[in-house]
Amino acid sequence: MKYSIEVGKIVEGALKHDYAKVINYTKQLIEKLEEDDETRAANKFSKLLTAQSETTLSAMGMEKVNPVPVDTESRTALADVIYPNENKYEVILSKNNEEKLKSFILSYQNADKLNSLGIGVSNTLLLYGPPGCGKTKCAYLIARELGLPLVVARLDSLISSYLGTTAKNIRTLFEFAQKMPCVLFLDEFDAIAKARDDSNELGELKRVVNSLLQNVDSMSSDSLLLAATNHENLLDSAVWRRFDYRLEVELPDNEAIVEMIDLFTTNTIELSQKEKKELSTVFKGLSGASIEEIIKKAMRNAIIGGSDFSKKSIYDEFFVHKNILPQNYQSDKELMSIKAKYLRNCNEKIFSFQVIADVLGSSKTTISKLVKEEID
């Protein structure tokens, strides 16, 4: 049955007198009806909502109907809610990971069809890999593509020093996320999902993992749970099994790096494909976050220093980021020699003496001599 998720949630909310759930899922149903050109039905449901009392109408903003729960001790919110119109993150992934992410999104978008065939929906995704590679941005992308709010757990509030409070907070957060159409995102997941056989951990953490597993198991099939970790080796084996999709978000490949260079230099400088290829060679092995940081710092320094932002600015900031330049150097020639040799060692075919000269603002003859150590 089409719209079975929304109808089921509305009925469930009505039976439990959960008006937040009724309103939020009715709004989602209206949006889907409008997308399918079911204008008459959409208008009918819209009129039902707008005919409610002033109190209910004021609650139609999700944050009023369904306030974000707080930790009972600190009174701080257990999560931040990011709405689709506030979600501006862009993420660039390898083509393989892009396809896997699309598959996960399509699974949810076709939930009605899958449920009608008795197949069920894959609604849990674990993102893992090195820091700065886009795991968090993937969560934002999924929520935006689905047009759903992203509920981002706040670990500083979720984890409590009081016995039993962390497990209680986890349960409260899961209950909150099931009251509305949303994507629940648990970042730095290993903090609450560590292996229970770790002898260095206290019994409290083991109770937390047990609570987490119970809450994941009790999630309805139409809810979405995303989790991310930089330390997948620390996760409890039972936690791994709870995730239908597991996506390793790796360091960007050359193609992804070139796309990042395009994105981060938009409306600033024009780089040729050859120049982008050269930059992607030196950026190899860096995370997307590091590449963004290098380019934005170079841009910032150029603006503050009153100079033009150029590819040389990017290379200069790259050398600083890699920390290959000595703090105490004898001459500018020494610095240029270090930079020239570094680029040459990256790839001799790409970084010819002429290319290095263009990058460093020198001559081909000088660079040749520096690389061959013919200048004292």
Please report, for each region that a protein language model flagged, where it lies by residue.
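Aromatic/hydrophobic pocket-lining residues that form π-stacking "cages" and hydrophobic walls in ligand
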Residues: 29, 139, 173, 189, ...
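Walker A/P-loop NTP-binding motif of AAA+ ATPase domains
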Residues: 96-100, 106-271
